[in-house]
Amino acid sequence: MDPSDFPSPFDPLTLPEKPLAGDLPVDMEFGEDLLESQTAPTRGWAPPGPSPSSGALDLLDTPAGLEKDPGVLDGATELLGLGGLLYKAPSPPEVDHGPEGTLAWDAGDQTLEPGPGGQTPEVVPPDPGAGANSCSPEGLLEPLAPDSPITLQSPHIEEEETTSIATARRGSPGQEEELPQGQPQSPNAPPSPSVGETLGDGINSSQTKPGGSSPPAHPSLPGDGLTAKASEKPPERKRSERVRRAEPPKPEVVDSTESIPVSDEDSDAMVDDPNDEDFVPFRPRRSPRMSLRSSVSQRAGRSAVGTKMTCAHCRTPLQKGQTAYQRKGLPQLFCSSSCLTTFSKKPSGKKTCTFCKKEIWNTKDSVVAQTGSGGSFHEFCTSVCLSLYEAQQQRPIPQSGDPADATRCSICQKTGEVLHEVSNGSVVHRLCSDSCFSKFRANKGLKTNCCDQCGAYIYTKTGSPGPELLFHEGQQKRFCNTTCLGAYKKKNTRVYPCVWCKTLCKNFEMLSHVDRNGKTSLFCSLCCTTSYKVKQAGLTGPPRPCSFCRRSLSDPCYYNKVDRTVYQFCSPSCWTKFQRTSPEGGIHLSCHYCHSLFSGKPEVLDWQDQVFQFCCRDCCEDFKRLRGVVSQCEHCRQEKLLHEKLRFSGVEKSFCSEGCVLLYKQDFTKKLGLCCITCTYCSQTCQRGVTEQLDGSTWDFCSEDCKSKYLLWYCKAARCHACKRQGKLLETIHWRGQIRHFCNQQCLLRFYSQQNQPNLDTQSGPESLLNSQSPESKPQTPSQTKVENSNTVRTPEENGNLGKIPVKTRSAPTAPTPPPPPPPATPRKNKAAMCKPLMQNRGVSCKVEMKSKGSQTEEWKPQVIVLPIPVPIFVPVPMHLYCQKVPVPFSMPIPVPVPMFLPTTLESTDKIVETIEELKVKIPSNPLEADILAMAEMIAEAEELDKASSDLCDLVSNQSAEGLLEDCDLFGPARDDVLAMAVKMANVLDEPGQDLEADFPKNPLDINPSVDFLFDCGLVGPEDVSTEQDLPRTMRKGQKRLVLSESCSRDSMSSQPSCTGLNYSYGVNAWKCWVQSKYANGETSKGDELRFGPKPMRIKEDILACSAAELNYGLAQFVREITRPNGERYEPDSIYYLCLGIQQYLLENNRMVNIFTDLYYLTFVQELNKSLSTWQPTLLPNNTVFSRVEEEHLWECKQLGVYSPFVLLNTLMFFNTKFFGLQTAEEHMQLSFTNVVRQSRKCTTPRGTTKVVSIRYYAPVRQRKGRDTGPGKRKREDEAPILEQRENRMNPLRCPVKFYEFYLSKCPESLRTRNDVFYLQPERSCIAESPLWYSVIPMDRSMLESMLNRILAVREIYEELGRPGEEDLD
């Protein structure tokens, strides 16, 4: 739909935006009976009637118009006098109050009101029992008879205010429509409409039955002397067109037929306020506390239909005898206690008065009463509004004479005010609301100009900016304002990687490119887009240095193509800098989309008075999509991307595709017939103007101008628009509606390159051409304009577009006045007069010549450092020898390097050089390797010094080795790294007969001599180092020897190797030996060979060459059959150590698998679990537990951490076992999200108050009862240590609190309050970037037992359990 399809008087912009005061209540629909108000002459409503069409709408200017159409003002009307202005207030329509058409009786007024039939029915006396309440409000408000002595006093109007006349139209304050010229204005006509008023604004005719008569008019204000005759029926006005009450009367007399428009603000301000001075209480007010019974009896007396009581919440009718519920102090009734409770919990929104529609600010003065035909409760701001609303509801509405005149909505079939008129084909649909308008568009499948965010209709105003456009997902989106555009972008923003450089960007900040296959790709910049296009074209070639900085290319590299030459760049900055300079000589243009340089004929786009140049058609199409180059196609009338602009009969038209161009040409040719031609010169399709015969061919032209210009070009007499030379012009282009000719492509490129920098001295560039006016575009004089406007003729096509363009007069093109003929030339015989001088213009084009010069930014010469060499000399200083108080020199020893020259011979010099060379060979360049070699030499020398003792304590006691130990700093912070490097240097994978249990025995005295120095260095454990660090700083100096001697004086069996690192060579060599021994005797028997399905499986010696299935079944067989070189069976912890080594070997060789958690290795995991389930830790004589598996081994082979959901679960179970002491699956299954909580507290330390974060576990009550039995149980429960895991501030990567918080973030939020689950099964298809890693299904018992058996084989588990509980810091 387009706004131009609406008739001018029913433009959607001119309709009211909000309901007027006294219109439909908020909770009442169109289907209910609506009663008008007759309380005061200051109010009037227009009954809903059929909205007139633009053609049938006439403005009633004079009473003569009323005589021609007397039915316009038929019906019961009422003349209201306000300030000297007389206008008609229409009577409300009738309401059927029964078959007899009863009348309302008023004791204060003897006037009878006729019923629907036009006859006066029988008078019904009032009910004497009603008391004061029996006085009906109608009587005081009915029109008075001419002979009635009772008159109504008009409200007082202040004199110092002025009358303001405005319109009450919706949302169109800026629109204005002028009256046609030449139409005289009647002296009795209404004043000129204000801005925003259109013809027919607010004029509705209400017709009644022919038999109805109109009551006489009330007199005007006293002193005016203006009375209206009963026969004169002024045109009715809506309630929204009243005059403001507080306005003084106009001095002049205004005819009663004048239309007085009143603004919406005036109508809102005219509600009666009891605080005003001129307020008159027209009738006694009914108390809002009136009982329901008296209220029902009064309404029953007025209407034959009884009122039904309904529930205030669910609107269910209450039956007679049913129990009703009511809250104290509130009048609402409810059918059940649930409705009462639900209604009370409703949020209290902004309440508005049912009558005046104003917000109720003071709830104390508000009145809630059950009134109206439906018997529902309504809230009013004051009792005055309640009385006025009851009077409005009690007055009968006369029925319209013709029910077909009522305007009904085409969607909901309700009668009411028309908000939209839609012309679909030949049918005009009238719609009452925006929701019906939306349903109509959805039912008809119409694509109207609506906002894609909020769905509101976008009204196109003249001179106002159009809608906000956005090209998204291949569609053009429209938005009514920038707020909706921002909300749409925020809602649909996604982050995508650039196809070329993989940079993450937001989709609305990226550039889209559609390839030949229709696939859309997103890029972060034009550099990446151009590089992708060059790569797709297959023009990259071999890698070369960067075309700008000559550096080697990095990945990814960037490309650009200029004149069949592909340039390569190392970075986007080089790509951009290269575009600023021309790679070669000649003229190059820059593409407006990809900013690449090219020297071919450009693709040109003329859009919004700007001309854009592109290197190819693809860039032009991408630019259209990016910038939203959208126009309405002249053929299909749809807004799509602009394809081409063509001229038809001098008018430029836009098209969306080539098919629409051909179809429009076909229709245009049929319309013009045989006279339709295509101009040979300007190529426009128009009517034949001139025909010319050239070389036996017939050429058609649209005008003489085109013919003359074509003949100049054909005869080679035209000049080039670039170099101004005559001759053969090969290039022709269309430039802003004109034809330009050029000598060759070089001149054409020069013309395009100077479009933004024209040289006005030598040639007329594009900008200068715009400044030069053609003879047709000269401004006309006012006299010519006036004459031409009187003869203006509009075509039907122009009349159809009046809604789209501003309303203004268009003058028909007239032929310019021919100039006077020049005087005849005087004939001359002089031959010199026949000579024509040859004029030539020389154009000077300045071009900046770019030079490149290399500069060195890095230092390439070695920096010369001046090293001062101090030489001691004796300088005599005179002194006073302490006889006077003068500064005395003070000697301070300063270490100064002084070169010493020792005398030597030639033989000793040669030996010194040889010694230096030997030291260079022995000492490696890596200092870490040098420390290891020094350590090995130190141990070797120690063994030679003392053959009897191999203990490290004897070595330390030796004074010669003490200095070497201190220099190596074996016991410093880098001790662990040095030992790990030493172990890895000793890893020899091809070493035969490597025995793990022989190298790592339970008894430290049986250490293998090949690795004994490694374990000797481990005699001082981390506990001893921590004890040393806890000592004061003054005592630590020189304590290294003391601590070492104390540790050596202990029993040699009190310690075992610690933190030796995982050596994967044991596992790999054991695998090779097992495979070799398995296939040593040839092929194995069929019963012993491994099978994967029907095919036999042969295990390979190289673990990396094995597939997942081979590794699974091979490891399972390896766990069952592996033995030591001496034939004995490995212990379970040793087998676990070998498997951890195999896992580390796979990871270090980029085989990213986890043989302990992946589902492919389930058979191996089950077999390993069988082996570990029977293992029990060995207790050494010093009451320590021995195990070859350490915690550090699990961190090295990535069995602890956050590498996968299973690894994270294994880490949590490891910490819970280590710190909580949970050693069975039942104890782990008692964990839940409610009894494992994160807490933070403040504790006091010698350094001050710090915040400590920990994880606490509150064991269930039944577990405590099972452990604590007998007397004193309560005391033991209170004194039981709290199980907690404290944060690791020294190493946050191994902090239990961090792992627990990360686990909670990956669990479903709905399970964080469960008290029966803690370990959850991971999702089957989840990646590291997934927001959730775990499902709602808990881990089964078998999987927990398998993980727990592997954890219980770690030595640190039992060391932590053997430590005494630390005191709580609370």
Swiss-Prot record:
Zinc-finger ranges (MYM-type): 332-366, 378-422, 429-464, 477-511, 521-559, 567-604, 612-646, 653-692, 699-733
Origin species: Homo sapiens
Record PANTHER family: ZINC FINGER MYM-TYPE PROTEIN, ZINC FINGER MYM-TYPE PROTEIN 3
Result for mutant: R1274W: In XLID112; likely pathogenic; reduced nuclear localization
Signal peptide start and end residues: none
Outcome of swapping Y1137N: In XLID112; uncertain significance
Biological function: Plays a role in the regulation of cell morphology and cytoskeletal organization.
Name of this chain's protein: Zinc finger MYM-type protein 3
Tissue-specificity statement: Most abundant in brain, moderate in muscle and heart, low in other tissues except placenta.
Composition bias, Basic and acidic residues: 230-253
Gene Ontology biological-process entries: cytoskeleton organization; regulation of cell morphogenesis
Compartments, as annotated in UniProt: Nucleus
Outcome after substituting R169S: In XLID112; uncertain significance
One example GO MF annotation: zinc ion binding
Annotated spans, Disordered: 1-72, 90-301, 759-830
One Pfam family in the UniProt entry: zf-FCS
Reported effect, E241K: In XLID112; uncertain significance
Chain positions found as Phosphothreonine: T795, T817, T826
Cysteine disulfide links: none
Single GO cellular component term: nucleoplasm
Glycyl lysine isopeptide (Lys-Gly) (interchain with G-Cter in SUMO2) crosslink, residue number(s): K308, K320, K328, K778, K786, K804, K847, K861, K920, K1275
Primary site of residence: nucleus
Positions with biased composition (Acidic residues): 263-279
